Regions:
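Generic beta-strand/beta-sheet core signal
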Residues: 103-105, 141-143, 172-174, 220, ...
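Single conserved hydrophobic/aromatic residue that forms the stacking wall/gate
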Residues: 2-13
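Short, structured coil segments at secondary-structure junctions
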Residues: 8, 165, 366-367
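Conserved Radical SAM active-site core
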Residues: 15-165, 175-204
Length: 390
């Protein structure tokens, strides 16, 4: 049944259609875009925003700051709640859209306004309580900045979030590039301050385990690398629900590689050579993982290379921000063997471009090697290493 109304040229045209379909039958409709309209952009000017620290000349899509509650539900994007209307809040609650992922950073209203350069940022924290009271699952993120929202402020924030009954909170250290001219003077974490932050998060997480049966608060892997501490065991991370935030990735990969190797028989006949390239931060653990593989396949030569991030500079040392240009510059004179293995997180969704717009074809051509992007799991990594030449 089609019920249409129109008031003439230029007026609003509204159509209501009722359809009937069989049980389990597809409705047969597709939207042109998954959001059906434009993405909502961010209205904040956060003092720690990574996008504000990007160099000029990168592809335009990298400079877009989204802050859209629909993307939170669809893809797990974090939203700040400064760009959401009462109507949208009511709709989320009415439709029980869950989970919602929120960039909290601090529950101190005045400090949140300062950190996000938005005078309304403190007011929107009330939405957290409304969501929690409605039974909406809340996953939270805190970008921790030394001397600003760490220490006692972090304790306050975690206490408030625990009392709200949030599902999970990922705490990650601020990332600083060399492109910070005219930006807020932030300082990076060091060994001492990273260790102090780990102690706070672990202590409060341990208390949550005793009271609620789950940890709730998780420090990013980068904190442990900065503090030069061992990564916790896989059990610490429970269901590994925050891998996309850099929480537990090293423990997950190490454990998953171990399980994969248990399924395979040792094979001394494999005698090819491969290179695996990663960020400087994870390099010691990647060396350890490659040693695990070598124990089972001793005649495979594995060249593990840490790539210094000259493109972003600063303290950026994570694998996902390694660029194609840095790979080419630093591996040009290496004997790379049959294939160069990288994490697929270095590439955009289509797996064809690095952040600096260097393509995978460019890297293969310049280095004369087959480039093999792998996902962050043991099966893909082990198979890529033992496969040899294509």
């Amino acid at each position: 049944r089609d019920s249409s109304t129109s008031r003439g040229l230029g007026d609003v045209y509204k159509r209501q259609i009722e359809m009937t379909k069989g049980e389990y039958e597809e409705i047969g409709l597709e939207f042109e875009t998954y959001l059906m309209d434009k993405q909502h952009s961010c209205r904040n000017k956060c003092i720690f925003c990574f996008i504000d620290q990007l160099p000029k000349g990168m592809r335009e899509s990298l400079y877009f700051k989204d802050d859209d509650s629909r993307l939170s539900f669809l893809f797990g994007n974090y939203i700040t709640l400064t760009n959401i209307t009462e109507h949208e809040i009511d709709r989320i609650i009415k439709m029980h859209i869950s989970p919602i992922n929120v960039s909290v950073h601090t529950t101190n209203p005045e400090l949140r306004c300062k950190m996000m350069n938005n005078r309304f940022a403190g007011d929107t924290l009330k939405y957290l309580k409304r969501f929690a009271d409605a039974g909406i699952t809340l996953n939270c993120q805190i970008v921790s900045c030394p001397g600003i929202n760490d220490g006692d402020e972090l304790v306050r924030t975690l206490t408030d979030l625990e009392n709200l009954g949030v599902n999970m909170t990922a705490i990650v250290p601020v990332g600083l590039t060399r492109y910070r001219e005219n930006l807020y003077p932030l300082v990076p974490y060091n060994k001492e301050t990273a260790g102090q932050t780990i102690d706070i998060i672990e202590k409060m997480g341990d208390e949550c385990v005793k009271k609620h049966g789950r940890r709730i608060f998780f420090p990013g892997d980068e904190f442990y690398l900065l503090a030069e501490r061992e990564i916790p065991s896989p059990e610490f991370y429970e269901d590994f629900s925050a891998l996309e935030d850099g929480i537990g990735m090293i423990a997950y990969l190490t454990d998953d590689v171990g399980w994969k190797l248990e399924e395979l028989d040792a094979d001394e006949s494999l005698c090819h050579k491969v290179t695996i390239a990663c960020g400087e931060g994870v390099f010691p653990y990647m060396k350890r993982i490659m040693s695990m593989i070598n124990e089972k396949f001793p005649n495979i030569t594995i060249n593990t290379r840490a790539i210094k991030n000259n493109f972003f500079g600063g303290g950026v040392n994570v694998s996902g921000l390694v660029t194609g240009g840095d790979l080419i510059d630093q591996l040009r004179d290496d004997d790379l063997g049959d294939r160069l293995i990288i994490t697929s997180s270095m590439l955009r969704f289509e797996n064809d471009l690095f952040l600096d717009d260097v393509s995978t074809d460019d890297v293969e051509r310049e280095l004369g090697v087959t480039l093999v992007p792998v996902n962050n799991n043991g099966n893909d990594l082990v198979e890529a290493v033992i496969a040899g030449k294509d």
